[in-house]
Amino acid sequence: MPRVQFRLAGLIAICVATWPAPAEARLVVDRVVVRGATDVTTRVLAARMHLYSGDPVDFAILGAAEQRLIESDLFSSVRVFIDLPTDEAVRRMYLDENTYPVAVIVEAVGKHSWFVFPTASFGSGDWAGGVVYANQNLIGRDVQLISAGQIGQSRSYAFVGYRDPLVVGAPLTYSMSALYRREQIRLFENHGMVLQVPTIVAGGDCQIGWVLSPHTRAFLGLSARYQTVNPAEDLASGAIPLPYNSRSGRIFLLQFQFQYDDTRAQEGLRQGILLFLKNEVSDRYWASDFDYSKFETRVELYGHYWWNYPSLILKMVLNYPTSDHGVPVTEMLRIGGSALRGYLANEFHGDTLFSAQAEDQAVLLRLRLPWTQVRFNVAAAIFVDAATLLDRHPGGTTVPPPDTLPPPVRSKLDDIHASFGGGVRLILPGVVIPALKIDVGYGIDVRDVAVTVSIAGGGIM
């Protein structure tokens, strides 16, 4: 009996080894044909789809290519297919052993690629206004250009940035930007401004990244800026000057960044998950005039049930000096205003930040803009914000100023600032940033109300 079993097993093994393998896909890409109203070049489309001349084609590959184009956010509608009857396509893909070149057809309607819009914000003891130009498909090459300018009570700037989200022929991305900013660094005590420090920052940065998946990217970068710090002014009468790093000089940073983002906003209301990690290091070893390390992590969760869109944003930033040259005053952590509603703009400062923002938006109305086909949402929101920002290294260096008390090791109850309130949003479909946002928040520990109004986010930085 065992001998019969061995013979049967041997016959099965021989049959498996000699059985003809199923035919592989025999349709290959000949060219990409574009139909419809889009100015995206054929070369860019092929790179986005990961389909090049000579690559095999089947229904799974076509479906994956179409999904990649949808995720590019360049099209209002898109379809990827081959111009063959279904039965003929199946025969050539899976049954016929001959090779057939075929045209891959992309039928698409592109989104309007460029925008010019005003930005503004006022309330919480500050105001600013500016304009932004953004183009997410410059000359049809799937590269992005953004430029912005702002004039404000405490911050004015000019900014230009260029980004290639996916290099043709490689899973790479790169970006570069330049910035000029004048800012009054305000320091507060007991819900009132003590002094302000005039500063100027000019420079730029560049990054190169790896596109690990449609939602996942990792970056390495270099930032080079020069900071000028002028003498403090507007010292409040009878106030004791707060310590800060008054050093001017070069800020050279090595950067690492990781991001996972599968959020979407078809109606302008976000859904999905965003994970963000970033580490920046400045050191005199590479000719920087400052020594510090900054680590930031952020988690953003956006949901949807019925007509509600709840969200939760958790953030942690550690910004520690590594020598007596310390952290530049312009890189000091600050919070208040839109990031901690119910308080003055940038009311709190320090080097160890933990914050949370919980919000629920409910769509009340869906209306149409006059004389257009564009619809927008009117939403109401309720929110709770909380944050603690410790100053473990007063003055931003490892050498504490004279007569300074030792900083706390961990947060006490008095170090936690919380607020609650509500607001209204006007939201355009497909645009993540609300066109108009009004929030009224009550700061619990300061027992005060702050109103914040922003148009198009109030600016890009």
Regions found by a protein language model. Give the residues of each.
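C-terminal transmembrane beta-barrel domains of outer membrane proteins
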Residues: 49, 73, 273-461
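Periplasmic polypeptide-binding modules associated with outer-membrane biogenesis and secretion
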Residues: 24-122, 132, 146-166, 202, ...
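Conserved helix-loop functional segments at active or binding sites
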Residues: 260-267, 363-368
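Sec-dependent signal peptide recognition
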Residues: 3-11
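Gram-negative/organellar outer-membrane beta-barrel architecture
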Residues: 79, 98-263, 273, 332-338, ...
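N-terminal signal peptide c-region/cleavage motif recognized by signal peptidases
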Residues: 18-22
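Short acidic, glycine/proline-rich loop/turn micro-motifs
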Residues: 46, 187-190, 234, 393-397
